[in-house]
Amino acid sequence: IKLLMSMGLKNVIMTDRKGAIYEGREGLNPIKEEMAKITNFNKEKGTLAEVIKGADIFIGVSAPGTLTQDMVRTMAKDPIIFACANPVPEIFPDEAKAAGAAVVSTGRSDYPNQVNNVLCFPGLFRGVLDARASDVNDEMKVAAAYAIAGLVSDEELTAEYILPAAFDP
């Protein structure tokens, strides 16, 4: 989340089982307290279904079935869905698209746009080793993201192909 915010995302609202995470919410662990300080500046409260209304993007790293078609329908026009729970995503691509999603990505290899760490780690770590770096900083992560994005040409870019497949040549 910190990296996404550093790249310009503005209105980020994180949720957990109890709903929106915001500064001052009772019962937050130290990590969630830290995230509450840099996200949800309007201190929106409520369930995922309540705070997702009007959202452009959903990034899920939680549990199967967390996002419903009704929730997708309440999002902004042509929302982008990253449903990365594995092996069963927060919502399946066909369901998300039927509800109006423009782009859908999952952590599964049997659907287009698989988000898989195999796209990043070999090259990122090769660069870290070659540079004899002692840590992986945000600049390196951003460079890796741009390098991966650059593997899909403008001619190839479609809603079904925003990320290269792990086994693309």
Regions found by a protein language model. Name each.
Residues 1-59, 63:
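Glycine-rich phosphate/diphosphate-binding loop of Rossmann-like nucleotide-binding domains
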Residues 1-2, 36, 49, 56, ...:
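Predominant activation on well-ordered alpha-helical scaffold segments within soluble catalytic domains
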Residues 1-2, 22-23, 65-70, 89-91, ...:
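Short glycine/serine/threonine-rich phosphate/pyrophosphate-binding segments
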Residues 3, 38-48, 57, 61-65, ...:
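Hydrophobic alpha-helical scaffolding
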Residues 4-12, 75-78, 98-104:
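Secondary-structure transition/capping motifs at alpha-helix termini
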Residues 7, 15-17, 60-62, 75, ...:
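Generic beta-strand/beta-sheet core signal
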Residues 44-99, 132:
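Long hydrophobic segments that form regular secondary structure
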Residues 83-169:
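Adenosine-phosphate binding glycine-rich loop
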